[in-house]
């Protein structure tokens, strides 16, 4: 039995506190699309995705209207393309292989535009130990792909707790990010490239979503969003002890997650596919009040980034997970609090006033998901420094048995004090300083950082 107060509370969450379903993401298996002939491969991919996803946007909109809950993004993720290119690329020169990979990426982009989804993820390679020849070609093709597509997202998993860190891949990804920044407007291509440690197979969020090899043929995964709701709750708890704050956040996360599961299951049922998971991640937007940083400040920090930020974030992340896990048996993806600088109005302000630096963000990634996200750095930053930043973040994920990632944007012609405007969900990125001391010798060593002792769990 619902009481009027609960109904009013739900209306407030949606109308005034920016509560929404951030994404319903359709995962599609493409393993059965592989073919020696490039044209047949592209045709198979087109037929498979459109057969499952042709009505995704229409269905999500219908469910959104039925429940009065906004579904902000409709997206598609596919099997990592690096896993299905082997037979197609056999016998081709390196240049031909790169072009073939890009053609597949363009096919994905055309499909995304035809079915009306915001992004399509899965232009991906899983190279945590070593890369196959086709995966090397796919990685090499990423900068060119970003100049020719609008909606395709690329991700590369270069480390896991079980495998260690592939430092050859880390070095290469620094170079790929640098090259992409130089050939796409305002380095926008870099906003669609993520480097992972312990990448989840069922992540609904971009730019890191792909349909993992262990998944079924098609599945709907939902991602919720509710920083504004959590902030409103915390602001009512002035003077309460931190345990009480945690408990109230937990209750709020429960309600948010229930809504996400309801909508996700309904969309899956309408499409005739399985329901996968709800991702519990609190995902901010550039909208005022829809900010993770503002939640931390409501807990008691003058500015996000000051001493105590990591502790407050750890409490927030844990409370969200506990509340969400109670609300759903189908929790997965990244499931934490996102801290993307350019997509969070409070984070942007904290950087601009000098409260939040790259080193503090790195510490914060130890206790939340997912990593250094949407970080803009000076365009003059060398590729080796980008690789070293990636390596540090991969080490945090590997040792702590958690997902970490890096989405970093070296913006040509920009330096500390400048900012770059992307608009929409990508927001505004203030340029953050990086160390001027070199890490080049470390990165040039290559090889593999061995898996840590805590990987031996059997």
UniProtKB/Swiss-Prot annotation:
State the InterPro entries in the record: UPF0210
Q: Which HAMAP family match?
A: UPF0210
Output the lineage of the source organism: Archaea, Methanobacteriati, Methanobacteriota, Methanomada group, Methanococci
What is the recorded name of this protein?
UPF0210 protein MmarC5_0151
| NCBIfam families the UniProt entry points to | PRK05313.1 (NF003700)
Into which family does the record put it? Belongs to the UPF0210 family.
What is the disulfide pattern of this chain? none
Domain of life assignment: Archaea
Q: Which organism is it from?
A: Methanococcus maripaludis (strain C5 / ATCC BAA-1333)
- Pfam assignment, any one: DUF711
